[in-house]
C-alpha cells in the first residue's frame, strides 16, 4: 500500500490546477453564475489559522457550487493601503510599498499552499496604480454630484497614529487600531455625504433576507433614526435662537435649563465677557475627558453657566443656558432642552447645579414629588402641568404636541439620524491621493479624469508630524491648474482605506481594464455577490460604506443593482488559550507549520470540523491530531479497497443480501445529509461527521465480510461517491483518489454526487419489544408488516414467552416501525 505523504500530493495537485488553469473563470458561460467572495485581507505580515478559517469556508462554497454546475467567480486580493505600512516605514526605515509587497508575497504563498480555488488572474491590490486610479475616479463621481465636500469640522484625532478617525473608527473613546484615547481637533476635512442615503440604507436592510439579523440590527442602530420635533428657544436679549431636536416634545413644559455641547460655536457667541476666562478653563478640562465616556449615564456631569438665559417658547419662562460635558456636537443639534424630571442625565446635572425639577409626566397610579425624587421618571404616563395637554396620555401627547407646535410656528416635525457624513481625509502618505487641486484664481478644481491616477511619489519623508507627508513634498504639491494653467497646489491628504474596500468587489470583474473601472455588462452579469463571507467586526464600517457606494454608482447609471451582497455569512473566531490570536499574546498558530506537519487537507478539515463555522472555537492540538488520524484511516481504507474496484464500474449493480442493501442505504442517506448540511446553512462540521460515519460503515463491512464475498460494484460506488463528497473539504486527497481510481479527468471538474431516493427506502426494520415497561427483546421484520403478523411473530419468540409465562395479555401496543409494548 502506498504511503500518505500529504506535502508531495498537495504540491503535485496544486501545480496541475495552476498549469491547467482549472479555476480561471470565463466572463460568460451557459451555466448559471455564482460569485463567492471572502473579505480580502490587510497584508500586515503572515496569516494565522484564524484568517485561514475565512478562506477555507469560502473555498468549500466555491468548490461545491462548481460541482453543482455553476460558473463560479472566486477571486482574491489585498486591502493594501493603510497605517501599519507607514508605521513600519517610520520604525524600521522600510518604504511602505516595499513592506506591503513583501507581505503580499508571503500571504499569496500561504494561501496557495492551502489549495484554495482562487482565480489568480484576477488578483488585485488596492495600492496598485491600476486600482487606485479608479478609487480616485469614484471620488470624482461623488464630487461632481455634490456627494463629496470639504468643511471645517471637529474631528476625532489619534495622537499616536497622528491622523483623524471617522466616528466608526472610535470605540469607547479610543482609536480602534491602537487603543489610544482620542482627542478633538478642528480641521478642514473631506467628507462623503452618506447622510443623503440614510433612509435608503435603513429601509433596504429589509431586502437583505440573506443577511444575519444581528448584523442588520447593528447597521440600524448605527444609522439611528429618530422621529421627533425641532424647536427654537429664543435667547433673551438677542436675535439668536437655540435649536434643539427632541424625541420627547411631550416634556416641553418641564424644560428648566438649556445645555450646549462644549464644541458648539454658540458657546463663544453667548458667554458673558466676564466669564470668558473661566469658560476657557472649563473647556480645556472637558477636552481632556474621554468624549464618549463623558456622555454615559454613570459619568460625572459637569457644566458651566454662560450667564445667559433662553425663553421656553411654550411657557415663556426664563431658563439658564449651560455648557455641559455630556452633550456631543454630533448628536442632534449639539444643544439639548434639559428636562430633569424625565431624563436621568438631566436629573443628575440639575441636582448638582441646583436647577429646578418640574414634573410634567406622571405615572397612571401615583403622583411624583420633585423634592423627593431620587431618579428621573422616564416612562410613559399622563401629561400634567402641560397647559392645554393636561390629562393627555404621553404616548398620544408626542404626536399632538408636534401638530400644535407646527400650528403655532414654534417648531416642526423632524427626522434625525445618528449617522454622520463619512470623514474620508487622512493625514498620511500610504493611501490613495484625493484628486483635487487648489488654484487661487479658480478655487477648488477636480483633477480631470484623463489625468488620473494622481500618483503617490516614492521619495517621501515619513515624519510623524500630524500633517500628511505629501504636504512636505514640493514635487507632488506644486502643479498647474487644469482650468487656467496657473500655479496651483494639490490636496495632500489621502483617502480613508475604507474607500478602497468600498468597491473592490466590482473591480474583480475586470481587474486589468485600463479605460474604465469595470465593464457595465460584465459587472451587471456577475453582481451582486451571491455569497459574501467575513468577520462580524465589519458589520458597520465596511458593509455600510460598500452599500452606500453601490447605491451611488447605481443612481449614476453605472450599475443595475443597488445592494452589493445578496447573502452574508459571518464566521466565528478561532481562539488559543482562551484568547484571540495575536503576536503580542504569543498564541498564534501558523498554518505553515500545520501544513508542514499534517498537510493542508488535515488543516482544512480540522478548521471546519472544530465547531459550526459561525461559532467561535478553541484551537486544540489534540483535535487536529484526531482529524489527521481519520485522514490516514481513510487513506488506508481507500487503498485496501482500490485493487478490488480499479477495473470495476457501477453498471448493473446487484445487491445480494440485506447487509449490502443496508450499506448502500447508508451511503445514499449520508450523501443526502452532506448535501443538505452544505445547502442548509453551512453545517460543515456535521457534513464532515457524515464523511467519517461513511468511512466507519465501509470499514465495518470490509472487516465483517470475507474478501471473496465483497460486492465490488457496490464498493466502487462507495469510494467514488466518497471521493466526490470529500473533494470540497480535502481537495488534494480527493484528486489523488480520483486519479488512482483510473480517471483521466480531475475530480474538481466532476458533478456533485447524487443520491438515489430508492436506495433510501428501508425494507426491514428492527423493532424493540417492551414487556411491562422494560425492553426484553428485539426483532427484525419487513417494514410494511401488519400488526397481526407482527403479533404472531413476537409472541412465538422464546424471550417473550419467558416473560409472558402464560399470563393473560392485557394490552399489545405497536408503534409502527419502532416498538411493541406488551402489558401482562
From Swiss-Prot:
Single annotated GO MF: aminoacyl-tRNA deacylase activity
Compartment(s) where it occurs, according to its Swiss-Prot or TrEMBL record: Cytoplasm
EC annotation from Swiss-Prot or TrEMBL: 6.1.1.4
Keyword Cytoplasm included in the entry's annotation: yes
GO CC annotations on file: cytosol
Motif, 'KMSKS' region: chain positions: 580-584
Substrates-to-products reaction catalysed: tRNA(Leu) + L-leucine + ATP = L-leucyl-tRNA(Leu) + AMP + diphosphate
EC main group: ligase
Pfam family, one: tRNA-synt_1g
Protein name: Leucine--tRNA ligase
Species in which this protein is naturally found: Thermotoga petrophila (strain ATCC BAA-488 / DSM 13995 / JCM 10881 / RKU-1)
Amino acid at each position: 500500500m502506498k504511503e500518505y505523504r500529504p506535502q508531495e500530493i498537495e504540491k503535485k495537485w496544486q501545480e496541475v490546477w495552476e498549469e491547467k488553469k482549472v479555476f480561471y473563470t470565463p466572463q460568460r458561460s451557459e451555466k448559471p453564475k455564482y460569485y463567492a467572495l471572502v473579505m480580502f485581507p490587510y497584508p500586515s505580515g503572515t496569516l494565522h489559522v484564524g484568517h485561514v478559517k475565512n478562506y477555507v469556508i469560502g473555498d468549500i462554497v466555491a468548490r461545491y457550487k462548481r460541482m453543482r454546475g455553476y460558473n463560479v467567480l472566486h477571486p482574491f486580493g489585498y486591502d493594501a493601503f493603510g497605517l501599519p505600512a507607514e508605521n513600519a516605514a517610520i520604525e524600521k526605515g522600510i518604504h511602505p510599498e516595499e513592506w506591503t509587497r513583501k507581505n503580499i508575497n508571503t500571504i499569496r504563498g500561504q494561501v496557495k499552499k492551502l489549495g484554495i480555488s482562487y482565480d489568480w488572474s484576477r488578483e488585485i491590490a488596492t495600492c496598485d496604480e491600476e486600482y487606485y486610479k479608479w478609487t480616485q475616479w469614484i471620488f470624482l463621481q461623488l464630487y461632481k454630484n455634490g456627494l463629496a465636500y470639504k468643511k471645517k469640522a471637529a474631528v476625532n484625532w489619534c495622537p499616536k497614529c497622528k491622523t483623524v478617525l471617522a466616528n466608526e473608527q472610535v470605540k469607547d473613546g479610543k482609536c480602534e487600531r491602537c487603543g489610544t484615547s482620542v482627542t478633538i481637533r478642528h480641521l478642514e476635512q473631506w467628507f462623503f455625504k452618506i447622510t443623503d442615503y440614510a433612509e435608503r440604507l435603513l429601509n433596504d436592510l429589509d431586502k437583505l433576507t440573506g443577511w444575519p439579523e444581528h448584523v442588520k440590527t447593528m447597521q440600524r442602530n448605527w444609522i439611528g433614526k429618530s422621529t421627533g420635533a425641532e424647536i427654537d428657544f429664543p435667547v433673551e436679549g438677542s436675535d439668536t435662537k437655540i435649536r434643539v431636536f427632541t424625541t420627547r416634545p411631550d416634556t416641553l413644559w418641564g424644560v428648566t435649563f438649556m445645555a450646549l455641547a462644549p464644541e458648539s460655536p454658540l458657546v463663544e457667541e453667548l458667554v458673558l465677557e466676564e466669564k470668558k476666562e473661566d469658560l476657557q478653563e472649563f473647556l480645556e478640562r472637558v477636552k481632556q475627558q474621554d468624549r464618549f465616556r463623558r456622555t454615559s449615564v454613570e459619568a460625572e456631569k459637569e457644566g458651566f453657566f454662560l450667564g445667559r438665559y433662553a425663553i421656553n417658547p411654550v411657557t415663556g419662562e426664563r431658563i439658564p443656558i449651560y455648557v455641559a460635558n455630556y452633550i456631543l456636537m454630533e448628536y442632534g443639534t449639539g444643544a439639548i432642552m434639559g428636562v430633569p424630571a424625565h431624563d436621568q442625565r438631566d436629573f443628575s446635572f440639575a441636582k448638582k447645579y441646583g436647577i429646578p425639577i418640574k414634573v410634567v409626566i406622571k405615572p397612571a397610579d401615583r403622583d411624583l414629588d420633585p423634592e423627593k425624587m431620587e431618579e428621573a421618571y422616564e416612562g410613559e404616563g399622563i401629561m400634567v402641568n402641560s397647559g392645554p395637554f393636561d390629562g393627555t396620555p404621553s404616548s398620544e401627547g408626542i404626536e399632538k404636541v408636534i401638530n400644535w407646535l407646527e400650528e403655532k410656528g414654534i417648531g416642526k416635525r423632524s427626522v434625525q439620524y445618528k449617522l454622520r457624513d463619512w470623514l474620508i481625509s487622512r493625514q498620511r502618505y500610504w493611501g490613495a491621493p484625493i484628486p483635487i487641486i487648489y488654484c487661487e484664481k479658480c478655487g477648488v478644481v477636480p483633477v480631470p479624469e484623463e489625468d488620473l491616477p494622481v500618483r503617490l511619489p516614492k521619495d517621501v519623508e515619513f515624519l510623524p508630524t500630524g500633517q500628511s507627508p505629501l504636504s512636505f513634498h514640493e514635487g507632488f504639491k506644486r502643479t498647474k491648474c487644469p482650468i487656467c494653467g496657473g500655479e496651483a497646489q494639490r490636496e495632500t491628504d489621502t483617502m480613508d482605506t475604507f474607500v478602497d474596500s468600498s468597491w473592490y468587489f466590482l473591480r474583480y470583474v475586470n481587474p486589468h481594464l485600463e479605460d474604465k473601472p469595470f465593464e457595465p455588462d460584465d459587472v451587471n452579469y456577475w453582481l451582486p455577490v451571491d455569497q459574501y463571507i467575513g468577520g462580524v467586526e465589519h458589520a458597520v464600517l465596511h458593509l455600510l460604506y460598500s452599500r452606500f457606494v453601490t447605491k451611488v454608482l447605481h443612481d449614476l447609471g453605472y450599475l443595475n443593482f443597488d445592494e452589493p451582497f445578496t447573502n452574508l455569512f459571518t464566521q466565528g473566531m478561532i481562539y488559543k488559550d482562551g484568547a484571540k490570536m495575536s503576536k503580542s499574546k504569543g498564541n498564534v498558530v501558523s498554518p505553515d507549520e500545520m501544513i508542514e506537519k499534517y498537510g493542508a487537507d488535515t488543516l482544512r478539515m480540522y478548521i471546519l470540523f472544530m465547531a459550526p463555522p459561525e461559532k467561535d472555537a478553541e484551537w486544540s492540538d489534540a483535535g487536529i491530531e484526531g482529524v489527521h488520524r481519520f485522514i490516514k484511516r481513510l487513506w488506508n481504507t481507500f487503498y485496501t479497497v482500490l485493487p478490488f474496484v480499479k477495473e470495476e464500474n457501477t453498471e448493473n449493480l446487484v445487491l445480494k443480501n440485506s447487509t449490502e442493501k443496508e450499506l448502500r442505504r447508508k451511503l445514499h442517506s449520508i450523501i443526502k445529509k452532506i448535501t443538505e448540511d452544505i445547502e442548509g446553512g453551512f453545517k460543515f462540521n456535521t457534513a464532515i461527521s457524515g464523511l467519517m460515519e461513511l468511512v466507519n460503515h465501509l470499514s465495518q463491512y470490509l472487516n465483517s465480510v470475507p474478501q471473496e464475498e465483497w460486492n465490488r460494484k457496490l464498493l466502487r460506488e462507495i469510494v467514488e461517491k466518497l471521493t466526490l463528497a470529500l473533494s470540497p473539504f480535502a481537495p488534494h486527497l480527493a484528486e489523488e483518489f480520483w486519479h488512482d481510481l483510473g480517471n483521466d479527468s480531475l475530480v474538481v471538474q466532476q458533478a456533485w454526487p447524487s443520491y438515489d431516493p430508492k436506495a433510501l427506502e428501508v425494507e426491514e426494520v428492527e423493532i424493540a419489544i417492551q414487556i411491562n415497561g422494560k425492553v426484553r427483546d428485539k426483532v427484525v421484520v419487513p417494514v410494511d408488516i401488519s400488526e397481526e403478523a407482527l403479533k404472531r411473530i413476537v409472541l412465538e419468540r422464546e424471550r417473550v414467552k419467558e416473560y409472558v409465562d402464560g399470563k393473560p395479555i392485557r394490552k399489545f401496543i405497536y408503534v409502527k416501525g419502532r416498538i411493541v409494548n406488551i402489558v401482562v
